[in-house]
Amino acid sequence: MNIAIFVSGSGTNCENIIRHFADHSDVNIALVLSNRADAYALVRAKKYNVPTVVIPKAEFNQEDKLMPLMQQYRIDFIVLAGFLLMVPGFLIDAYDHRMLNIHPALLPKYGGKGMYGMHVHEAVKAAGEKETGMTVHWVSRVCDGGEIIAQFSTPLSPDDTPDDIAAKEHILEQQHFPKVIEEVISNL
């Protein structure tokens, strides 16, 4: 199975996924795609000899740009790992229940447009939540609205800053995200 990982940022999850599947006989990380040429995730992918492609935001919604690329790399499954663009409907339809996303909160709380990265952790802090977590979900046409596949939580203390909350949530991502992907793929 050929997987494409879509990224916009530093790529810690991307690298973790690449490492997890490095010796997997049935899964190949075939492509890392970013909307940003300066995304450090591209450097991480190249370190493992994974092909990388940049499709600027202005071209990302163009079916004639994106779909031939998916066909060229024979992409069977897509993982959004810190990808900050809305995925176009034609791609969601083409990869129905074969595209998942990670979100840095316990959805449905703190999801939707504008809820990413530190914005989420600041909102969790402002609300005085007693726990935070991560959600892996299918990608749908509703931002962060797809069916939930898995959630993992961790307790918070009143003294936790948004940075502390982010660090706790990031540990969950590193521990669980690749395993959830593997489990989902094994059940396809």
Predicted features, each with a name:
Residues 1-188:
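One-carbon transfer enzymes
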